[in-house]
A protein has these predicted regions:
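A "functional boundary" signal
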Residues: 22-310
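Bacterial N-terminal signal peptides
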Residues: 9-19
Length: 310
């Protein structure tokens, strides 16, 4: 399972509290101009919310360096306005979305430079959910730079702070981060143990269903690396329950979560040479519209299943 895919999917979705308004449309510039007009003529929370929507529009275009430069300016303006109004919640959101923008541009040094001050801000203002999300991004930056020592140190610090607060969600998030550090080093057994403990804690809290289903996906990947196929199959009932809980909480279907489960089962049956069952899950994957599963992985599976049938 791709480590970086998780980061974009989970943290983009979990951190941002609003959807991109009209991001799929062709009138982005018109929307930006309209929001700038609103910002100019509004005050208070309306002004901050308009900044919030404006930087979301630019975040959909951050692959463009010029748009990223503009986004950084908008972040600065939004931060200044939040400080002027004394709105620490919106100020914290600015910092979080700035870090997400850097992670999605692979700007790991920027994250390592900026995140510590933002984490101090979150601690001071007791914005713990954002604290855990952004601490995860700092750990991510170290992992993707290959600095596993600092990644592990930050994950331990994150866990200790959560444990001190008796915050099970925070402890689970820290364990997730630790497991990812093992994942990128192919330390499968240690990864497995961390994800099992993480999952156990996440079942006791609400609001982290996306991370819970991703933890199951990574756990299956770790078990596959250890050829523990029976253990993968044992996980399936509770994995399905986790996805169902996610869908109920979100109020919509979660095709990516199902896709990760189907990939785990497809690969399990391919590895154990039960190609008929593997084919069933390949068909389910083909039925998921716009799934994010690797085209190479699907092509490989299709070839192996076809070859097995002579």
């Amino acid at each position: 399972m791709k480590y970086k895919t998780y980061l974009v999917t989970v943290l983009w979705g979990a951190l941002l509290s609003l959807t991109l308004p009209g991001a799929a449309q062709n009138n982005l510039q018109h929307q930006k101009d309209s929001l700038r007009q609103v910002i100019e003529h509004s005050e208070g929370i309306d002004k901050l919310r308009s900044y919030h929507r404006l930087y979301y529009l630019y975040m959909s275009e951050i692959a463009d360096d010029r748009k990223m430069d503009t986004l950084l300016t908008v972040f600065d303006q939004a931060e200044a306005e939040a400080i002027r109004q004394g709105n620490t919640k919106m100020q914290g959101m600015v910092y979080g979305n700035l870090i997400i923008s850097h992670i999605n541009r692979n700007e790991y040094d920027q994250i390592i430079q900026k995140a510590p001050a933002y984490l101090d801000f979150y601690i001071k203002h007791e914005q713990w959910r954002l604290y855990y999300q952004i601490h995860m991004q700092l750990i991510t930056a170290y992992n993707l730079k290959g600095d596993y020592t600092h990644a592990a140190e930050e994950a331990q610090l994150m866990f200790d702070r959560a444990k001190e607060r008796k915050d099970k969600a925070g402890m689970a998030t820290a364990l997730y981060a630790t497991a990812i550090t093992y994942n990128v080093q192919d330390r499968w057994k240690e990864e497995e143990d961390c994800f099992r403990e993480c999952i156990s804690l996440l079942w006791e809290v609400s609001g982290y269903d996306n991370i819970l289903t991703q933890a199951y996906a990574f756990l299956c990947s770790s078990l596959r690396a250890q050829a523990q196929y029976d253990e993968i199959l044992k996980l399936v009932p509770e994995y399905r329950k986790a996805i169902a809980r996610f869908e109920k909480a979100a109020g919509r279907e979660q095709p990516e979560a199902w896709g990760n489960l189907y990939v785990a089962l497809m690969n399990t049956y391919i590895d154990t040479k039960d190609y008929d069952k593997a084919g069933e899950y390949l068909a389910k994957l083909d039925g998921i519209v716009n799934n994010n599963i690797s085209k190479y992985e699907l092509a490989r599976a299709r070839a192996l299943i076809f070859q097995s049938r002579g």
